[in-house]
Regions:
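Post-transcriptional modification and biogenesis factors for structured RNAs
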Residues: 1-164
Length: 164
C-alpha cells in the first residue's frame, strides 16, 4: 500500500479526485493542515463520489508531525517541478510516501533542499509551469503501483455477459 501526502491542498475538487484515486488503489491519503477548504465541502465529496467509505484519510497539523512518525519505516519522495530525478527513475517500494505540495506554490524550497536526493519531477514542456495536482498524483501513484505489479488490485476486468 502506498501513501499519498498533500501538503496544504487548496482546491477541493483536486483533493476529491485524489481521494477517489487513493480509494481505488487502496492507498492512504495524508492531509497536512491548513486545508484550503472544509472536509464537509460538497465539491470535495462530489469529486470523490461514493468512494469515501473506502478511503483511509489521516490528518496532521504539520509535515514534520507526519515525517517524524514514519521516517524510519518508509521512503519519502517529494514531487516538484524542481526535482532532482524523473519519477520514472526511482524503484518504488510498498509503503513509500509520495509527497505533493499545494496547487499554487508546490512544496516549500527548504523542504525540497533538505530532501533533495529524494525529489522527483514529472517531465514536461518547459514553457508550462506545472501539471494539475490530481493528474500528477495519479501518474506517479500508478507508476509506483506498476513497478510493484499492481499488488492488491483487481488483476482483470469483466465484460457483462461474457463467459471467459
Amino acid at each position: 500500500m502506498f501513501n499519498v501526502v498533500l501538503v496544504e491542498p487548496e482546491i477541493p475538487q483536486n483533493t476529491g479526485n485524489i481521494s477517489r484515486t487513493c480509494a481505488a488503489t487502496h492507498s492512504v491519503l495524508h492531509l497536512i493542515r491548513p486545508l484550503g477548504f472544509e472536509i464537509s465541502d460538497r465539491t470535495l465529496k462530489r469529486a470523490g463520489l461514493d468512494y469515501w467509505q473506502y478511503l483511509d484519510v489521516r490528518y496532521y497539523d504539520s509535515f514534520d508531525e507526519l515525517y517524524e512518525k514514519y521516517k524510519d519505516v518508509a521512503n519519502f519522495y517529494f514531487l516538484s517541478t524542481k526535482g532532482a530525478k524523473r519519477y520514472s527513475d526511482v524503484n518504488f517500494k510498498d509503503g513509500d510516501f509520495l509527497v505533493f505540495g499545494k496547487e499554487t506554490h508546490g512544496l516549500p524550497e527548504p523542504l525540497l533542499e533538505k530532501h533533495y536526493e529524494n525529489t522527483l519531477r514529472i517531465p514536461m514542456w518547459e514553457n508550462l509551469r506545472s501539471l494539475n495536482l490530481s493528474n500528477s498524483v495519479a501518474l506517479t501513484l500508478y507508476e509506483a503501483l506498476r513497478q510493484n505489479d499492481f499488488a492488491g488490485l483487481n488483476p482483470k476486468g469483466h465484460l457483462t455477459g461474457r463467459k471467459d
